[in-house]
Amino acid sequence: LIALDLDTPVVALESTVITHGLPRPQNLQLARDMEKAVREAGATPATVALLEGKIHIGLSDGELVRLADSESTLKVSHRDFATAIVKKADGGTTVAGTMYAANMAGIKVFATGGIGGVHKESAFDISTDLRSLAEIPTIVVCAGAKAILDLPATLEYLETMGVPVVGYQTDEFPA
């Protein structure tokens, strides 16, 4: 990514919102809007995805269209990279997957709508996003955890794992 070589600010963006989060054509519009918002804030957007089994950090508009239009993309978390690469698959990266790839590329800031967390009334369903937040040295800017989750348990898990949670203009853990 040229922006990293020039020592300019770079913000990583996930791609599962494009591949699995929203229907067409809203998914493509959101991808373009996210990149536009990063540019307007003075940084370079770097949407992370897999294309033909290769990790891409920063996508062209044509690549965004390809992801948005595809019905066969994989959902790629941290644990799924090896399988997706071997299959030469296209894939949208989750929060954990994006953090992993961005960190390997030297990107330290990542923005997303919402992180995963501890699921309600579940035997033991905890998103790998939380472990990644504890282990990968990346600043994650988000609107909070997804509203369908057990927010108090998610916040407790983050505290237990030593993840600082900082709210901007709020005293609550937002969803």
Feature map (PLM): residue ranges:
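Internal alpha/beta core interface subdomains
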Residues: 9-11, 15, 32-36, 159-167
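Glycine-rich anion/phosphate-binding loops
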Residues: 25-32, 89-97
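Internal active-site segments that recognize and position negatively charged phosphoryl groups
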Residues: 91-118, 144-156, 161-163
